[in-house]
Amino acid sequence: MFPIIILISFSFTFLFASVTSGAGGVTNLSTCLINHNVHNFSIYPTKNDQSSSNYFNLLDFSLQNLRFAASYMPKPTVIILPNSKEELVSTILCCRQTSYEIRVRCGGHSYEGTSYVSFDGSPFVIVDLMKLDDVSVDLDSETAWAQGGATIGQIYYAISRVSDVHAFSAGSGPTVGSGGHISGGGFGLMSRKFGLAADSVVDALLIDAEGRLLDRKAMGEDVFWAIRGGGGGNWGIIYAWKIRLLKVPKIVTTCMIYRPGSKQYVAQLLQKWQIVTPNLADDFTLGVLMRPIDLRADMNYGNTTPIETFPQFNALYLGPKTEAVSILNEAFPELDAKNDDAKEMTWIESALFFSELDNVFGNSSDDISRLKERYMDAKTFFKGKSDFVKTPFSMDAMMTALVELEKNPKSFLVFDPYGGVMDKISDQAIAFPHRKGNLFAVQYYAFWNEEDDAKSNEYIEWTRGFYNKMAPFVSSSPRGAYINYLDMDLGVNMDDDYLLRNASSRSSSSSVDAVERARAWGEMYFLHNYDRLVKAKTQIDPLNVFRHEQSIPPMLGSTQEHSSE
């Protein structure tokens, strides 16, 4: 159990003076860190600096999207790895004292690199939480405390060490950091049964811009509401989450069913899928991942029709194999599920099975300790976009999607099913609003390995074109988007008088403009919850210390009041 400490006092002389971003600024920051017992950091190397390999090894370790690894991308002045909550508090205060912008990195999976790149021109640091990754499970209360740097895989593994009938509902990527994942909601294979990861958070420890360590009571219900689904990098730094453990059976069933074929054949399957899956029992999740080509060319499916599209139906059923196959065949006979398509295993084995740790779907390893791994060998360049679907796709819509998918062999399309408990949780329970009325969510995803800007632009433009083609068929007014699939195409906080730095110097009118400009994408991510998030941001971080290109802006009126206290 983590101690609940509301305020940590240090002997800081807190001078918010402007500091030159050159060598003097770095010296001031490093001196401040050392004086407050923070020694685990690496400074951007000078030309002849022998420690450059350490800096770049740290930078690259959790840099998951290679689009942001190019030499011309902005680099952090310092990478800091706090080892304790005291060091984390000192880090925040030292960065503020020396006027460095803070980027917080947990697992480094930000789709737009916001945890390790800043584009507003300010000198910035990365506060990397990988050393703060402890998970403490208490079976008596059926809860666990997970530090913000713990990955989803580490949480899963820690739970499995003490119980084979408890679990946590979150995503399939084990190297994803819990700090960011839960902050954005956290959809996963058990969300139809238990809701999002953020729905199971019962308390949290947040370090704010003043260095205060706040639990749920101390931060207040408005801020506690906001940090669950309101997106990472906005409110402060999550030191730890307290999560509720969820009861699961000892045996669950996984299925991966491949039905490659012509676009017409696959479109007909998908049309039935979208009607069936939202109405399945809560215990059953049946998602779809589609690729334009068969990446498993050595497999013989006995299909005599031309293979134009390769759909993979992924299922998790919280029960035995016989029931799973029976349910599928009764509800979705067109899929023609066989006993051989299903496997019984424990819940933790299913987490490994769907983990893609070996860059394949259906991990064959039985070493569940691999879920603790933080490093991804198979890194790529990628771009993703998202949608929500409220009305069943027509045949025209399905064919449009499959035709666009076929244009890029280095891509996939994901349909995540909704319904179940997701229909029953209020759209205002936490900041994540996409609940009742959604049939499924869509992810458009391109990945590539060419270190060529022209090729990168080609793949990115394909993703944008696909997204634009699907506009008539998805949610509208506003068109919904998932904050964990961050998408800078929707807009950024970098227009004229709204630069992310120097929040306290902006006029009241520019603050209003900033809030209204951010509404363009803020309401796509958060719908009617956007205004409440602005209020929470103004309450917890009025000076906009924690920010990025798509962060929630504060209203300035409270900033001025705060500054005059």
From Swiss-Prot:
Signal sequence range: 1-17
InterPro entries in the cross-refs: BBE, FAD-bd_PCMH, FAD-bd_PCMH-like_sf, FAD-bd_PCMH_sub1, FAD-bd_PCMH_sub2, Oxid_FAD_bind_N
Enzyme class, first EC level, given as a word: oxidoreductase
Example GO molecular function: oxidoreductase activity
Any Pfam family matching the protein: FAD_binding_4
Enzyme Commission (EC) number: 1.1.1.-
Keyword Flavoprotein listed: yes
Cofactors that this protein relies on: FAD
4Fe-4S recorded as keyword: no
Disulfides per UniProt: 32-94
UniProt keyword list: Alkaloid metabolism, Disulfide bond, FAD, Flavoprotein, Glycoprotein, Oxidoreductase, Signal, Vacuole
Sugar-modified residues: 28, 40, 363, 502
GO biological processes: alkaloid metabolic process; nicotine biosynthetic process
GO cellular component, one term: vacuole
Every FAD-binding PCMH-type domain range: 72-248
Functional pathway: Alkaloid biosynthesis; nicotine biosynthesis
Residues the record lists as Pros-8alpha-FAD histidine modifications: 109
Compartment annotation: Vacuole
Family: Belongs to the oxygen-dependent FAD-linked oxidoreductase family.
Task performed by this protein: Involved in the biosynthesis of pyridine alkaloid natural products, leading mainly to the production of anabasine, anatabine, nicotine and nornicotine, effective deterrents against herbivores with antiparasitic and pesticide properties (neurotoxins); nornicotine serves as the precursor in the synthesis of the carcinogen compound N'-nitrosonornicotine (NNN). Catalyzes a late oxidation step subsequent to the pyridine ring condensation reaction in the biosynthesis of alkaloids.
UniProt-recorded name of the protein: Berberine bridge enzyme-like C-2
Species the sequence originates in: Nicotiana tabacum
